[in-house]
Amino acid sequence: MKNFLIILLFTAFGFSAYSQNKDAVVGEWVNATGEAHVDIVKRNNKYFGKIVWLKNPKDEHGATKTDQKNPNESLKSKPILGLEILKDFVFDGEKWTDGKIYDPKSGKTYSCNITLKSDGDLNIRGYIGLSIIGRSEVWKKVK
């Protein structure tokens, strides 16, 4: 009985730590190039991220950078700053999956998974079709 209670205690502790980890992506992150900060938030048990800082928010003419590469003509005038680029991620117990990432430099949207690395950084994996055919980059938490 004593062993059973100890196992039960460790199991409960494990589930508690596990459930706390699901929001580890929430917060502000700097992308791999250092050109942008993305604030990841949780809404209705899904995770979303928008650009909240740009190293160069203005174009070469001094105008606010807009989403010029967007395939939707009506969105091309939308500012990059404030643009939601991560959408609809769900936590599957190990990583955040089933989401989409939008690349304003190309105007393309990709399937995406996010993994929390052991050092606390995020591994962002964008892909088309299969996850093995894609590109990864590492984002660091803004301190």
Predicted regions and their residues:
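Beta-strand-rich cores of mature extracytoplasmic or soluble domains
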Residues: 78-129
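A short, polar/proline- and glycine-enriched secondary-structure boundary/capping micro-motif
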Residues: 51, 59-62, 108-111, 133-138
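Short Pro/Gly-enriched beta-strand edge/turn motifs at strand-loop
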Residues: 20-23, 69-71, 93-96
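Tryptophan-anchored aromatic micro-motifs
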Residues: 23-36, 51, 98, 140-141
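Short, surface-exposed beta-strand-loop junctions and turns on beta-sheet-rich folds
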Residues: 46, 55-57, 104-105, 130-132
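Edge beta-strand at a domain terminus
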Residues: 119-121, 128-143
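Bacterial Sec-dependent N-terminal signal peptides
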Residues: 1-21
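Short, solvent-exposed loop/hinge segments that bridge or flank secondary-structure elements
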Residues: 31-69, 73-74, 78-80, 84-91
